Amino acid sequence: MNEEKTFSDILFKSTLAVRLINLVKPIVSSHLEQCLADKSLNYDELGDEHEKMLKKAIAIYANLGTVVSDLEKVVVFLRLDKEKVSQIYPDLSLEEYYNYHLENYVIRINSLPDILAQLGNTICNWGIPKKKCYGTTIPDSTKVTDEDIKNK
């Protein structure tokens, strides 16, 4: 039996995900252990700049995974038969139901370039301030070089 892979499956089994997880696992383990032993420590402040970057990158990647998973859930909701929707959600009109999930889908889709920009900014050390780092600002940034974005 050939099971269909979801985008989440592909995302979390990608080379980037595997490398990030393998790099960050011992760091996170050590920092959590230190924080448990000494409650005065701040997890986010532990580690050298490289370790902090890896912890930030894995958090952004996890956020990307959450958004992708949410998109997959929206598709499930949008596939529901009209009669089934009416049975499950009798207080909602079909228009309200579908508008809600379609808006949710659009919001999630629109957040993907921003999350990817944050991930690139973190991994490539572009130095773009977080408040100015969006998918739409990357093409205009002088800090992003052709070497950072390669066609493969």
What annotation goes with each model-predicted range?
Residues 2-102:
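Charged alpha-helical initiation segments
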Residues 92-152:
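Short non-catalytic regulatory patches outside canonical folded cores
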